[in-house]
Amino acid sequence: MTLESEIEGLWERYQEGLTAADAEPQVDRLIEEFLTALEAGEIRAAETVDGEWEANAWVKQGILCTFGLREITAHEYGDVTYNDVMGLLETDDLGERGTRNTPNGTVVRRGARLGSDVIMMSPSFVNIGANVGDGTLVDSCDTVGSCAQIGENVKLGANTLIGGVLEPVEGAPVVVEDDVSLGAGCRVTSGFVVGEGSVVGENTLLTPRIPVYDLVEEEILYGHLPPERRAFTRYVDSSVGDHDLFEGGAYKPAVVATH
């Protein structure tokens, strides 16, 4: 059996009521194999199919099984004792791969992958299922959520939030493609895709619910920013302004994209 088929079988059992208390030792061994494959980049929570990003549902099922079929235990991290169903990623090999993590607060959970020549500044957090590509900067106060796919040579500005998407399992995670620069304070959520080579201004919110006014192709987009764009926040008229409670009109955020 393949790892995929084994995880799918475990997911079926979990959906039928299997609990951490009932799980056999081989369940934990399977979950450990699964987490190790994620960390090695052998499997990923999403991949491109015919040029479009799609979730690997079975990988997200495996992550949910990890949470549901392992007992909470105490773990030590420096002088801190914390309680979780898994430990943190082993970082002994980071230096030999050219990856740096500064002290006092760079946290990478099991099941996440860090590429080579990555820089993680304190404090920052990378969650399970996330994939951070080679040469990427994760700056101070950044969060890379569960299953997020971050490309190579990406710059995540300080205080940037990359949202996690675990459920529904069919839902594609947030994707930031290669050579993207996100300014400080940006937030990318709910499966939004930031196209390769784009530069996004500080404090921009990218989410499928906010329209992207692409001035290059003169179209309004939802859920993705095309490659090689310069994007920033502006405000446009909102129909809410027609309500009597809003004297002088009302405005809603929008993203404007140019070359």
State each model region's role.
Residues 95, 100-239:
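Structural signal for interior beta-strand "rungs" in well-ordered beta-sheet cores
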Residues 1-99, 227-228, 233-259:
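Terminal amphipathic alpha-helical/low-complexity segments used for targeting or macromolecular assembly
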